Amino acid sequence: MDKFLSSAPVLLTAMMVFTAGLLIEFNRFFPDLLFHP
């Protein structure tokens, strides 16, 4: 359980970076889908 607790922030950061990169790539290919009224 200690190994999981020590690796949790790393996994959380990796997921945040992955999600941000995915949003940026999606916004680059489909710029009008994220900002439609």
UniProtKB/Swiss-Prot annotation:
Task: List the Pfam families.
Answer: PSI_PsaJ
* Keywords recorded for this protein, A-Z: Membrane, Photosynthesis, Photosystem I, Thylakoid, Transmembrane, Transmembrane helix
Key word Thylakoid present: yes
| GO BP, one annotated term | photosynthesis
Q: What is its main location?
A: membrane
> How does the record classify its membrane topology?
Single-pass membrane protein
Which cellular components does GO assign to this protein? Answer: photosystem I; plasma membrane-derived thylakoid membrane
* Role according to the record: May help in the organization of the PsaE and PsaF subunits.
Q: What lineage does UniProt assign to this protein's organism?
A: Bacteria, Bacillati, Cyanobacteriota, Cyanophyceae, Oscillatoriophycideae
Q: Which residues cross the membrane?
A: 4-24
Q: Where in the cell is it found?
A: Cellular thylakoid membrane
What is the official name of this protein in its record?
Photosystem I reaction center subunit IX
